[in-house]
Regions:
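Metallo-beta-lactamase
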Residues: 1-102, 106-118, 124, 133-188, 206-213, 238, ...
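Short, P/G- and charge-enriched loop/turn segments at secondary-structure junctions
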Residues: 44-49, 127-128, 186-187
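Metal-dependent catalytic neighborhoods of phosphoester/phosphodiester hydrolases
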Residues: 120-130, 260-262
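Residue-level marker for the onset of beta-strands and adjacent loop->beta junctions
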Residues: 1-3, 55-57, 128, 176, ...
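Short, basic/aromatic-enriched C-terminal tail that caps enzymatic domains
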Residues: 257-275
């Protein structure tokens, strides 16, 4: 098991809860083997010569007695909720949260950066019906995500679950620029999808959680990725604004440790890396 990643920024504690690290083919992230091999700093943390690292993880934010889980395992629904696997993954995740000191019953808010998957926002009960996985939490999404979903919900496996939870009054929304907790601010970026939002921590900001703007740290070197983003130029422009200023970057889908600093055309592992 990888060492736990924890950051302290002012009165906020951020803790990464890792479910699994995996190696996957580059085309899953819109990359090629040539792209992977072009990144000099890929090994050993982020990629091999032929595959890149990814994770299923969740970030826990603790501030002033409140507990928020940010984008819990927001990918790979076809694996996490495969009917053939039953409740194996949800049961294992619930046990993991308990073991890591964050029982699901203690979470106040499930903060989702954009509507795309179910992840561990919800689970099927014994009757096969979808219910919130965090029983005492409100689900919070960017207002732009809610507006975009109401306008064009699409026809994806997650669509019906989101429709059910929204209609049941389980979902709240926040505006662009909203302060989630003192020292944590939302920024609507779009680019990946209409409501995609990143979150900044501290006054610098000292850290930025990127959501799916960079599915892998390799995307910080490989440039435009139209396979991942309907607005690749916009995504790349936003990412460029997060380099060379000393901030820590956090990626929810990145392999352990899931954080680093972008400086001088390289991505330096961890929060303590020199810049």
């Amino acid at each position: 098991m990888a060492e736990r990643t924890t950051l302290q920024i002012g009165g906020i504690t951020l803790t990464r809860v890792l479910y699994i690290d995996v190696m996957i083919p580059p085309e899953v992230a819109g990359l090629t083997i040539d792209d992977v091999q072009s990144v000099a700093w890929r090994a050993p943390e982020w990629a091999s010569d032929t595959e890149f690292g990814a994770s299923a993880s969740a970030w826990i934010i603790e501030s002033e007695g409140e507990r928020i889980v940010l984008d819990p395992l927001q990918a790979a629904d076809e694996v996490l909720h495969d009917p053939a696997a039953g409740s194996a993954h949800t049961d294992a995740f619930i046990e993991l949260m308990e073991r890591e000191g964050f029982p699901v019953e203690t979470i106040d808010t499930v903060l989702i950066s954009h509507i795309e998957t179910v992840g561990m926002m919800g689970r099927r009960d014994e009757a096969g019906e979808w219910v919130p996985l965090f029983p005492n939490a409100r689900i919070v999404i960017p207002r732009a995500s809610l507006v975009a979903f109401e306008r064009a919900p699409g026809d994806f496996p997650s669509t019906a679950v989101w429709r059910q939870f929204i209609d049941a009054g389980l979902v709240d929304s926040i505006d662009d620029g909203a302060e989630v907790v003192p020292g944590m601010r939302a920024e609507l970026t779009g680019a990946h999808n209409p409501g995609h939002t990143v979150f900044h921590f501290g006054s610098g900001p000292d850290a930025t959680w990127l959501g799916h703007l960079a599915v892998s740290p390799l995307h910080l070197a490989t440039g435009l990725c139209p396979q991942q983003h309907p607005e690749p130029e916009r995504a790349w422009e936003i990412l460029q604004g997060f380099r060379d200023d000393g901030r820590v970057l956090l990626g929810p889908l990145w392999p352990s440790p899931g954080i680093g600093r972008w400086h001088n055309d390289a991505f330096h592992v961890g929060a303590d890396s020199a810049v």
